[in-house]
Amino acid sequence: MLAVVLTACEKGPVEWRDDTRQLALPVSGPESSEAEAHLVLRADGSPALEPVVTVATMPADSAACPGSLRIAALSPTEIYGAWWSRRENGRAVLFSARSDNAGATWATTVPVDTTDRGTLSCERPAPSIAADSTSGYVHVTYFLNSPTGPGVFFAHSMDRGDLFHSPVPIMYGDRPSASAVTAADSLVIVAFEDPNSQRPQISLAMSRTWGHIFARERPAASTGTTSAERPLVALRAPQLVVGWRNGSAVTARVGTLN
């Protein structure tokens, strides 16, 4: 009886608010996309979309996949980028680089993941990148067909992007899936399209160890929606917000971490 009572009282990893909010993208023009905006949680707990940092130059890579560069700012001057670079036979390499002068110039390109065995080339979702000012770590998530199978993966650097640790699988699955990552010191949250779902849905992966180990649970974030894709995520512990693209707007759901 005790075991039954304890099980019934267990809470999920996130307690979601009942409502969702529609947020307009802070960009204009026919080419506008969520790549030009990032999700934030204000001090009052309300979600908002803000323009991403802009850079004067891009990291030098003649094989870079168009539109795949994603940017994260650790400070006004310390900027990180991650992008796909095409290779032969439909494969791609995930690269990163750091700028110490707000994107005017870039340091040496560093490989994040070179293990792709797929044939998607540049026809895959762009990576996501987050730079945490508290820990100084850089976190990257992406979809790739690895030697152990296709799926969503996570990798991070503990030394200002000079070296990335071996990738960690978030979820294996065949469907190319977009993802988003955010961090606040030891707490890392990954929002991702479920690569096994027939209908696009957003799930979460959580780590309280700077991304070294992720909890086994993959709680759903877009429950109650017919379709959710291209996730966004932001964190102001203990609150987090997850967003997904909905036409010309972003649907956002706020929750509290248990």
Features from the language model and the residues they span:
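Extracellular, repeat-based ectodomains that mediate carbohydrate processing or recognition
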Residues: 10-258
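C-terminal motif of bacterial Sec signal peptides marking the signal peptidase cleavage site
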Residues: 5-8
